[in-house]
Design a protein with these regions (language model features):
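Extended hydrophobic/aromatic segments used for targeting, binding, or gating
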Residues: 184-206
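Thiolate-centered catalytic microenvironments shared by cysteine-dependent enzyme domains
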Residues: 1-86, 103-104, 119, 169-192
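Short Gly/Pro-enriched loop/turn and capping motifs at secondary-structure junctions
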Residues: 131-134, 168-170, 194
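Short cysteine clusters
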Residues: 164
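Conserved beta-strand elements of the Class I
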Residues: 10, 90-92, 161
Length: 206
């Protein structure tokens, strides 16, 4: 793709969480010069900006030396279990109400598959990722976001874990907290419910 270590990369997706997940993955892998197109193609098109349909030209291959991963952005299964047992962390579930309540394991509108068990990580607070967005999939204002997170106990100094089903929606919460509100202790559990709901012996709340 012609991307080097210093190339600026702008992501968008449809739905928007796929663009955010790509942003998060690049940042986690040490590529810092990345950005997110707020509102994505939906907003771009609504504003009358140009679109193309032709196939882009191929870019010459470039060397890419991997950087150190930023492990401060990610939390693993055993660490989540420790956080549940220890208490004190704010765990935010970005899934739909149906998934959070245990009525489904899959997202609305799709197959109800992906995990053996339904429910949520014990103590998790429900904050559907879509609550952070306007109708055109732009992030709400910082004041609105701050109020939403504070209502769910996510104070600026809190240790926060975000998760969903496959971690795409969880990265939307992470982006809002870290990039728009400046929170410094936020980690994505990227195993999310696809891992937790298939594990043997971990606690599940419904």
């Amino acid at each position: 793709a012609g991307i080097g270590r210093d190339t600026r990369v702008v992501f968008y997706g449809a739905p928007m969480q796929f663009g955010v997940y790509a942003w998060w993955t690049f940042r986690y892998c040490g590529h810092k010069n990345v950005a997110l197109l707020d509102g994505g193609r939906k907003r771009w098109r609504a504003e009358g900006r140009p679109l193309v349909t032709d196939e882009p030209a191929e870019h010459a291959a470039v060397a890419y030396a991997p950087a150190a991963r930023d492990e401060s952005m990610r939390i693993l299964r055993d660490e989540v279990l420790q956080a549940v047992r220890r208490g004190g962390s704010v765990i935010l579930d970005g899934r739909s109400p149906e998934e959070y309540s245990g009525k489904r394991v899959g997202g609305p509108g799709g197959p109800d598959v992906g995990a053996v068990r339904a429910g949520r990580i014990p103590g998790a607070r429900h904050l559907h990722y879509a609550e952070l967005l306007d109708a055109d999939e732009r992030f709400k204002s910082r004041d609105e976001l701050r109020a939403l997170f504070q209502a769910h106990g996510a104070a600026p100094d809190a240790e926060i874990i975000t998760y969903c089903r496959m971690s795409h929606r969880a990265t939307v919460l992470h982006f809002a907290l870290t990039q728009l509100l400046g929170h410094g202790k936020v980690k994505v559990y990227d195993g999310s419910w696809t891992e937790w709901g298939n594990l043997v012996g971990v606690p599940v709340e419904r």
